[in-house]
Amino acid sequence: MIRDFGVTDVVAVSLYTVVPNAVGAVGLILIARRSDRTGERRRHFACCTLGGALALASLTLHLHSFAAMLACLSIAATLIFAALPIFWAVPTRYLSGNAAAAGIALISSIGITSGIVSPWVIGIIRTRTGSMDLAVYLLAALLALSGVALLVGVKGDAGRRG
């Protein structure tokens, strides 16, 4: 995306790539602290995933401003990064003993599988359509689905610290 705006210098691309990650790291800490302070997980996770999905989808608007694209990417990174530690607090609260071990193993297996499959699917979509838009929409939809699934599928008190 950064190169799509005409930034060709490798060092400049690298430095611009740091921005969403640095903003995301700070946001992760702030949002996770708030979730810990309030003890609320479900809504924090859902807000992060739904907001991250919206920020990702906004990248397909073909923004003509480099700053706007970088801002959308930074917001998406912040919310997606923040969703991860909040998510992992839920299974350990909801499951215990052998169920926790099996549940965490299942979640990890699904995550690893998606890490293998998603680059392949994104590559196929980009090759066939000549654009990343559909791939970004797919990622945004899956991200939103994860937030809704946790919000609907987990009891209200399971997302709270005990």
What are these regions (language model features)?
Residues 21-29, 112-116:
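Residue-level signature of mid-helix packing/kink "hotspots" within the transmembrane helices
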Residues 94-131, 139:
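A late C-terminal transmembrane helix in Major Facilitator Superfamily
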Residues 1-12, 126:
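Short amphipathic helix-loop junctions that connect adjacent transmembrane helices
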Residues 3, 35, 91-96, 126:
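Helix-terminus/helix-capping segments at the ends of transmembrane helices and short amphipathic helices
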